[in-house]
Amino acid sequence: MNAPALSPARRTKKLPPLRVGIGGPVGSGKTTLLEMLCKAMRERYDLVAITNDIYTKEDQRLLTVAGALPEERIMGVETGGCPHTAIREDASINLEAVDRMLSRFPDADIVFIESGGDNLAATFSPELSDLTIYVIDVAGGEKIPRKGGPGITKSDLLVINKTDLAPLVGANLDVMASDTKKMRGERPYVMTNLKALEGVADVVAFIEKKGLLMV
């Protein structure tokens, strides 16, 4: 039996919750970004998080162990198939997860939804996500921005993570920045070293400004 959807009468805040989708390839730093965002924003905003894995709930466990949010505010979804499908073509499993979390926490300000690791073609359904953040990492090589794909060209914010690894993999950050601007036009991007918290404040500021949380 499906969990009940959020009842509008239970929500006391005027604005609906902001749904932020976080996507990107396996190992790019999606879960780390989600952890850092939760820790940076939890004192000011009411947060819940939903993670996607194909056959496990490992990302949910990692966030819980890291103390990103209280355990009851983190839900793991086992998609059992292509992670792209679960956030785009048939997002019903995630839409139901959002409803379940909002039935528990009706005054949530932000619902973070982390996709399972996927390729550069992954995008979020507009029914599921209001803002999309796509994470790639320098370890994949400086060519990654040039490869394009909806995640790189159409996401609301592109995060280029693991900048500290550039010297180790022979990647030129200036080239990556230039290619990113060519591929994205005026759409913003942030270079980060999430383990050192570098760039996290910029991502938070983007969410607050673009999501109108500061109004």
UniProtKB/Swiss-Prot annotation:
GO terms for molecular function: GTP binding; GTPase activity; nickel cation binding. One of its GO terms (cellular component) is cytoplasm. InterPro entries: CobW/HypB/UreG_nucleotide-bd, P-loop_NTPase, UreG. The keyword Cytoplasm applies. GTP binds at G24, P25, V26, G27, S28, G29, K30, T31. Keywords: Chaperone, Cytoplasm, GTP-binding, Nickel insertion, Nucleotide-binding. The keyword Nucleotide-binding applies. It is found in: Cytoplasm. One of its GO terms (biological process) is urea catabolic process. Coiled coil: none annotated. Homodimer. UreD, UreF and UreG form a complex that acts as a GTP-hydrolysis-dependent molecular chaperone, activating the urease apoprotein by helping to assemble the nickel containing metallocenter of UreC. The UreE protein probably delivers the nickel. Facilitates the functional incorporation of the urease nickel metallocenter. This process requires GTP hydrolysis, probably effectuated by UreG. Belongs to the SIMIBI class G3E GTPase family. UreG subfamily. NCBIfam families: ureG (TIGR00101). This is Urease accessory protein UreG. The lineage of its organism: Bacteria, Pseudomonadati, Pseudomonadota, Betaproteobacteria, Burkholderiales.
